[in-house]
Every structure is written in C-alpha cells, then in structure tokens.
C-alpha cells in the first residue's frame, strides 16, 4: 500500500518534511530554493530540487551498500523521497579534506591546502546563533547525544569520507568538505538529512573549478549546470 503524505512537519532552507500515515516514515520534498548566509541570500533554480533528490538517493544507496545505515528508503517522485523517521541529534558533523571557507577565515590557513589527516568538527544546529562550533564536552554536558552515539557518529563520518573521496575522485572530483547529520531510531544511529552539492564542496580535480553551492554563494552562476555536471560524471540518470 502506498504511503500517504499528510501535513507539513518542517520547512528548512531547501527541503520540506512531511509526516505520513505511517508514524515511522517521513517524506522529504526537495525544493528548487537555494539559500546562503543564514537565509540572507535566496534564489530559485529550475530542476535543482529534482537533481538534489536523485543525487541524495544515489549517494545514500552507495553508502548503504558499503554498510553505512541511513534513513533513506526510496524515491517517490522527481522531488520526493521516503525516509525513516529519526530522532535527530541537533549536531552537524563536518569533515574538511581541503582548507577553504570558514576554516581559512578562522585559522588563517592557506585556501586550497590539503589537510592530512582531515579535520573533523562539530557544530550546533542553531540558525539564530549561526551554527556555533562545539566540542564533545558541550554535547555531553547539554545532553545532545551520549558518548556512545558521539563515537558512532564520528566513526560513520570518517568511513563515509573514505568511501566518498574515492567515489568522487574516480569521477574527476575532489571532495573538499561536507556536513552530515545523524539521528536515532530504536537505539541505532543512522545517517539522516541529505548528501547533495548543497551541503558539500566539490572541485574539479584538475582545474579546481567549484561545482557546488559555492557557485551561488559567490555569484559565479551556473548552479544547476554544475550540479548536473557532477551527476553526469557520477553516471547518474537524471
């Protein structure tokens, strides 16, 4: 029996989440919206929602095949996916393989510097406070996750890094950095949210051309075209 979409649960920067007639499942609707700088810059790009929906499904299926448990279940339509309902941790896990963006601004390191080993950072999901950086002591003290869950998130994040660096490199792309979000269902930590060019940085391996949301952030144009190029290189069917 088909899952029935019911009322809106939450509307974020580029996705809307709906509850369904099954309390264990949600529907993610990937919109064409794009925002940057905490919502100060907003624009719509034709087909972006469809590309991100299919891109996310592609990556989630690759990760699941490699043994990473995720909330993704299946595509429902051009812009909708069915996912497991998780109790999300209010935390972003960020891995940086190449220095750029806020890391360079904070630490004064050279833009484009290869980072070995990669840098791992936690951020609190709080738009009003601009997603401040936190550490494991904050997480433990304020009860955002327990130590076992924190270790599981870190382990999965680094395993995902190993998997995706190879996947993208084979497509002629550098995985510069990315963010992940996790949640809990029945005591198990699962990868939630999404993995799309909205939440990672991807550069051409030879030219270091930006093929991600930085094209929107920095007014470079060609946002949809860049996302399509990444999908094409990965062999995705759009």
Swiss-Prot record:
Q: Known InterPro entries for this protein? A: SAICAR_synt/ADE2_N, SAICAR_synt_PurC, SAICAR_synth, SAICAR_synthetase, SAICAR_synthetase_CS
Q: Which UniProt keywords apply?
A: ATP-binding, Ligase, Nucleotide-binding, Purine biosynthesis
Q: Which Pfam families match?
A: SAICAR_synt (PF01259)
- What Enzyme Commission number does this protein have? 6.3.2.6
* Biological process, per Gene Ontology: 'de novo' IMP biosynthetic process; cobalamin biosynthetic process
- One CC-aspect GO term: cytosol
Listed pathway(s): Purine metabolism; IMP biosynthesis via de novo pathway; 5-amino-1-(5-phospho-D-ribosyl)imidazole-4-carboxamide from 5-amino-1-(5-phospho-D-ribosyl)imidazole-4-carboxylate: step 1/2
Task: Provide the catalytic activity annotation.
Answer: 5-amino-1-(5-phospho-D-ribosyl)imidazole-4-carboxylate + L-aspartate + ATP = (2S)-2-[5-amino-1-(5-phospho-beta-D-ribosyl)imidazole-4-carboxamido]succinate + ADP + phosphate + 2 H(+)
Q: Which SUPFAM superfamilies match?
A: SAICAR synthase-like
Give the family, as the similarity comment puts it: Belongs to the SAICAR synthetase family.
Q: What's the protein here called? A: Phosphoribosylaminoimidazole-succinocarboxamide synthase
């Amino acid at each position: 029996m088909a899952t029935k979409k019911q009322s809106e649960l939450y509307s974020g920067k580029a996705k809307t989440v709906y509850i369904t007639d099954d309390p264990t499942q949600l529907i993610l609707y990937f919109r064409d919206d794009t925002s940057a700088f905490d919502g100060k810059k907003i624009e719509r790009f034709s087909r972006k929602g469809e590309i991100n929906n299919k891109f996310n499904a592609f990556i989630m299926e690759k990760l699941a095949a490699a043994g990473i448990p995720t909330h993704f279940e299946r595509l429902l339509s051009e812009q909708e996916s069915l996912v497991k309902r998780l109790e999300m941790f209010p935390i972003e896990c960020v891995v940086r393989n190449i220095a750029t963006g806020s890391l360079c601004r904070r630490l004064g390191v050279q833009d484009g510097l290869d980072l070995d080993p990669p840098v791992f950072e936690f951020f609190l999901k709080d738009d009003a406070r601009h997603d401040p950086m936190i550490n494991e002591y904050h997480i433990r003290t304020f009860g955002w996750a327990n130590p076992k869950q924190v270790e599981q998130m870190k382990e999965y994040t680094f395993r995902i890094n190993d998997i995706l660096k190879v996947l993208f490199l084979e497509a002629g792309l550098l995985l510069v950095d990315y963010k992940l979000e996790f949640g809990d269902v029945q005591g198990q930590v699962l990868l939630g949210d999404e993995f799309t060019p909205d939440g990672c940085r991807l550069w051409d391996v030879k030219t270091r051309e930006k093929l991600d949301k930085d094209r929107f952030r920095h007014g470079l144009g060609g946002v949809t075209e860049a996302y399509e190029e990444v999908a094409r290189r990965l062999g995705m069917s759009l």
